[in-house]
Regions:
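Mid/C-terminal beta-alpha module of Rossmann-like enzyme folds, strongest
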Residues: 213-279, 297, 302, 310-331
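Substrate-positioning beta->alpha
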Residues: 94, 179-180, 197-218, 225
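A conserved pocket-lining segment of Rossmann-fold NAD(P)-dependent short-chain dehydrogenase/reductase
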Residues: 133-135, 185-205, 209
Length: 331
């Protein structure tokens, strides 16, 4: 594959991608803002920079054949809209332009299923060719849609080929930064998650499957194309049941209805902002949980050889990893 450079290596998907590239023996450079012990012992090169600082990208991308762009901000609580836009949109534009200037052959961009407007009546959703932020809700979805369209439009310019992969809700190991799902697992471990949620469902995918799909996209993805990288859709209640079972915990007896969640969400949003903690429930996330999540991965299976693991295995691996990670932090 030649020289690979990747952004977002400290993230949930990014770290899994780094391990996948190294396991395949790829010459890999990671773009990071500062040193981190999570890279200790890994055979990768480091370039220091930031996607919102374009002058740092050209030096990092020099001589690269493939760039994987997974850096981004997933923000559920309100108040950080400018940061989200700057990283997700401007940062992606900076990456694209640096790829062109440096003669990069292929860019693989990590988009999201959130860029899709939900279809009614649980209709199956397949890949689309145009992404419009104005018909979406939430700053994350809007910024990822705008960035995705920019990457599509960049395909074929200045010798650059672009491929986009679009994961659903990511689970699995390597949750160093504590995602919303990871926060829930940590609360279950501590016995601080007292309720079973009686509404909503979502589509989940393991970060290791996303990483494999990203590499496959670089190797055989069609230029200018998007690929939905999703797994199983299960109810939130089933997710909690599988998580508690994986950790040997009892399933909570208290039930949280959508009505109660709707009532509590505005209060919780203030709490998350004041305490600067990872949000579990916001008004936006509740709406997402009750919207259509019936995504098809048929195209990725056919063209990329995508074959995701079961959600139960992924949840178990995530729970085991978080349990070990938190225990080691206390030593």
């Amino acid at each position: 594959m030649g020289k690979c450079v990747m952004t977002g290596a400290t993230g949930h998907v990014g770290y899994a991608l780094l391990l996948e590239l190294l396991a395949k023996g790829e010459d890999t450079t990671i773009l990071i803002r500062k040193e981190s012990e999570i890279f200790d012992g890994l055979d990768c090169k480091k370039a220091f920079g930031d996607v919102i600082k374009p002058e740092t990208l050209e030096k990092a991308f020099e001589g690269a054949d493939v760039v994987y762009h997974s850096a981004g901000v997933i923000e559920l609580k309100p108040g950080n809209e400018d940061l989200v836009y700057n990283v997700n949109v401007n940062g992606t534009k900076n990456v694209v332009e640096a790829c062109k200037k440096c003669g990069v052959k292929k860019l693989v961009y990590m988009s999201s299923v959130d860029t899709y407007p939900p279809l009614p009546d649980n209709q199956v959703m397949h890949e689309i060719s145009h992404y419009d932020p104005d018909i979406l809700e939430g700053v994350y979805a809007k910024t990822k849609a705008e960035a995705t369209q920019y990457v599509i439009d960049a395909n074929g310019t200045d010798g650059l080929e672009t491929v986009i992969i679009q994961p659903s809700a990511c689970i699995g190991p390597y949750d160093f930064k504590t995602s919303s799902i990871g926060e829930m697992v940590r609360m279950v471990i501590k016995g601080h998650f007292p309720v079973t949620i009686t509404f909503g469902m979502y589509n989940f995918v393991d970060v290791r499957d996303v990483a494999k799909a990203a590499v496959a996209a670089a190797e055989k993805g069609r230029p200018g194309e998007c690929y939905l990288i999703c797994g199983e859709a299960i109810t939130v209640g089933e997710f909690i049941r599988l998580t508690t079972a994986a950790l040997g915990k009892k399933e909570p007896k208290l039930k949280l209805s959508k009505g109660l969640a709707d009532f509590a969400a505005p209060i919780m949003e203030v709490y998350y902002k004041v305490t600067d903690t990872t949000p579990l429930f916001t008004r936006y996330s509740i709406r997402k949980l009750v919207s259509n999540c019936n995504f098809s991965n048929e195209k990725a299976r056919k063209e990329l050889g995508y074959d995701p693991m079961t959600v139960s295995q992924s949840i178990k691996d995530m729970a085991d990893w978080i349990k070990d990670f938190e225990a080691n932090k206390k030593k």
